[in-house]
Amino acid sequence: MKIWKDVFTGDEMFSDTYKVKLVDDVMYEVYGKHVSRTLGDVQLDGANPSAEEAEEGTESATESGVDIVLNHRLVETGFSDKKQFTTYLKDYMKKLVTRLEEKSPGEVEVFKTNINKVMKDLLGRFKDLQFFTGESMDCEGLIAMLEYRDIDGESVPVLLCFKHGLEEEKF
């Protein structure tokens, strides 16, 4: 199993249990789904719920949302306007370029070329994006973006993360 973590905060952002696609060698697209589940409910494969005794007087709470967000404890954040988002992107890209120059100098030019196209595209879709930090809620780290796409007539949540802001860990 692979888990992608924020290089600056160490927060888990997503894993390979989802469909992951790399776009322009700079952006991961992670395809999730909307789920509802009971809090504290552990479901075991092969268990027969009808054979279990019903517990009386217990109330169960449910949570619903995008599975990637819930499973990796991402926290929604926001930008007041496109200008604030642009400022974040510029500052974050400077941090990534500095890190790339230290760790992978050969990737800097490809990154700079491809990221400009991706950033322009993101800014054009600003109103359609939701924003999430990792569990630590450190806004100095990666802020993932979430959008909904129509795929085969279904609204599918897609989490967008900058490749160079992540490190891959194998378990």
Swiss-Prot record:
UniProt family annotation: Belongs to the TCTP family.
Keywords attached to this entry: Calcium, Cytoplasm
Signal peptide: none
The organism of origin for this protein: Anopheles gambiae (African malaria mosquito)
Free-text function comment from the UniProt entry: Involved in calcium binding and microtubule stabilization.
Domain TCTP: 1-171
Pfam families from the UniProt entry: TCTP
Entry GO CC: cytoplasm
Protein name stated in the entry: Translationally-controlled tumor protein homolog
Main location group: cytoplasm
PANTHER family membership: TRANSLATIONALLY CONTROLLED TUMOR PROTEIN-RELATED, TRANSLATIONALLY-CONTROLLED TUMOR PROTEIN
Compartments in which it is found: Cytoplasm
GO molecular function: calcium ion binding
